[in-house]
Design a protein with these regions (language model features):
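Conserved phosphate-binding/catalytic region of the ribokinase-like
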Residues: 1-4, 144-145, 196, 200-289
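Conserved N-terminal subdomain of the carbohydrate kinase-like
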Residues: 44-126
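Glycine-rich phosphate/adenosyl-contacting loop at the front of the ribokinase-like
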Residues: 1-70
């Protein structure tokens, strides 16, 4: 199949500590990470979004282009500034994020920024693109448009609660996006937040009953992944790894998953899903080392 994978959302400059009291300028943002990951795996990826027409924005556009990501729909916005995030790491390699620019250029995405979609293509989005207008309406329009064209939607909430002024807006947008998604990737914490259950089996059952996604994956870190495909549920153990920095691990997992799904289609059963999930887990594990 090898359908194109469009990734919509924010391209972010991450400022990472170097251990010497300085911050390093690094390309980041979950959607941008996924787009680059797909391209590195040999997939056909394109980025949809806005960055500022500023040094950080031009840096991000150049970086993605160098990685063979289609940037024809990555707009430089002279009126807005590129999203910039300070990343802080604890002794276990876990991270916290401080968003320095709000609202940033990515939240000014307009319908005219969208490409024409085609059958067999994928669109991957995260909830940050839904956190404010006009990006929210444009993102939902993109999800609906690719479904009408015969394509597929992948959704990774990647919830950042501090970016939402109204908690009910967050829940309403999550519900709408989850209902449109063919493939959903959640963390355990996100599953509990959305389903209202701390039990992973119960949470998966509630989401499957409510939203009926074709594929639902719940990542559990070192414990592996719970996968629900067309009503079948199974656990896939994690690959052992010594984590140095978990930043971007979930994005690498999604890139591996989407590369497999775009190449082979959504499988009919869990046995057929196993190779694509193994690739996703390998990508996620390698990203932490």
């Amino acid at each position: 199949m090898n359908g194109k994978i469009w990734v919509l959302g924010d391209a972010v400059v991450d400022l990472l500590p170097d251990g010497e009291g300085r911050l390093l300028q690094c390309p980041g943002g979950a959607p941008a990470n996924v787009a680059v990951g797909v391209a590195r795996l040999g997939g056909d990826s394109g980025f949809i979004g806005r960055v500022g027409d500023d040094p950080f924005g031009r840096f991000m556009r150049h970086t993605l282009a160098q990685e063979q990501v289609d940037v024809n729909y990555m707009r430089l916005d002279a009126a807005q500034r590129t999203s910039t995030v300070v990343v802080d790491l604890d002794s276990h390699g876990e991270r916290t994020f401080t968003f320095m620019v709000r609202p940033s250029a990515d939240l000014f995405l307009q319908p005219e920024d969208l490409p024409p979609f085609a059958a067999g293509q994928w669109l991957h989005v995260c909830s940050i693109a839904l956190s404010a207008e006009p990006s929210r309406s444009t993102t939902f329009a993109a999800m609906e448009a690719i479904k009408r064209a015969g394509g597929y939607v992948s959704f990774d909430p990647n919830i950042r609660s501090d970016l939402w002024q109204d908690p009910q807006d967050l829940r309403d947008c999550l519900d709408r996006a989850l209902a449109l998604a063919d493939a959903i990737k959640l963390s355990e914490e996100e599953l509990a937040f959305i389903s209202g259950s701390d039990d992973i089996v119960s949470g998966i059952a509630r989401l499957n009953a409510r939203f009926q996604p074709t594929l639902l994956l719940v990542t559990q870190g070192k414990a592996g992944v719970q996968a629900a495909l067309r009503g079948q549920v199974s656990h896939f153990p994690a690959r052992p790894v010594v984590a140095v920095d978990t930043t971007g691990a979930g994005d690498a997992f999604v890139a591996g998953l989407l590369a497999g799904l775009a190449a082979h289609g959504i499988p009919d059963n869990l046995a057929a899903l196993a190779p694509d999930l193994a690739l996703a887990q390998t990508c996620g594990a390698l990203a932490t080392t």
